[in-house]
Amino acid sequence: MNFSIEQYSKFMTLLDMLLHNLQTLHMSLEDSIKWLGEVMAEIGPNHSQKSEDFHVFEVKEANAIIDYLKISLFQHYRLYEFLFYSTREEIVIGTEQTIEVVKPADYPFPAPLEEGISLDTYSTFIEPLPTPDMEQKVLDQEQGTQEALLESEMREEDPLGGFTIDDVKSALERVTDEVLISMQKEISEKLQVQEEAFNARIEKLKKA
C-alpha cells in the first residue's frame, strides 16, 4: 500500500501501542488481537470519536494493516514475549593481563629467560647499561681479535712462494703443449676418417 506520511505516522503509533500492550501491560495474544479488532472496527465512514486517531485509513488499508500484523507481530508473538519477559545473562567480554615487573639483578632470584622476549623489550628494560669499564673491555677484545686475524693471515704461506717466474712460465708452456698436441691428434684422426669415407664413395662412383 502507498501510504501518506500521516498514514505512516499513525501506523507506527498503532505498532508502538501493540508493543506497549505486550511489554508493559503483558497482554496475551488473544487480548492483543481483540484490542486490534476493536480499534479497526471503528475505521470507516461512520467512525466514532474513540478511533479518531486512526480515521485516516480506509477499510481496504485497514485490512492490509491487519494482514501485515498477522504475518509479523502476531505470528511471532511468543518470540516477542520471550524477548520482553525472559531475563538473559549479561555476558561481559574482557581480558585480564598480569604484568610482572622485572626484578633488579641483585634480587635473590634468577633473572628471567631471554627466550620469548623481543629484542626491543630486552634492550630497553632488561639489558643493563654498559659501564665505562665494560666498554673498554669490549674494545680491547675487538682489537685483540683483529690483531689475531692479521697475524694468522700473515702466517699463511703463499702456495706459489717457492716458485720463480721462469718456473711458472715453463709449467704453463708444458701444459699448453700437452693440450695442443692432444687436440692436433684428435683433429688428425677425424680428418683421416673423413678422408677414408670420401675415398670409399669415390671408388663406388667409379665402379658404377
Curated annotation (Swiss-Prot):
| Any one of the GO BP annotations | sperm flagellum assembly
Q: Which GO terms describe its molecular function?
A: calcium ion binding
Q: Which InterPro entries match?
A: CLAMP
**Does the record's keyword annotation contain Cytoplasm?**
yes
Q: Where in the cell is it found?
A: Cytoplasm; Cytoplasm, Cytoskeleton, Microtubule organizing center, Centrosome; Cell projection, Cilium, Flagellum
Tissue note: Testis-specific. Expressed in spermatocytes and round spermatids (at protein level).
Gene Ontology terms: cellular component? centrosome; cytoplasm; sperm flagellum
Kindly state which keywords UniProt assigns to this record, in alphabetical order. Calcium, Cell projection, Cilium, Cytoplasm, Cytoskeleton, Flagellum, Metal-binding
Q: Which Pfam families match?
A: CLAMP
Cited function: Calcium-binding protein. May be involved in the control of sperm flagellar movement.
Q: What is this protein called?
A: Ciliary-associated calcium-binding coiled-coil protein 1
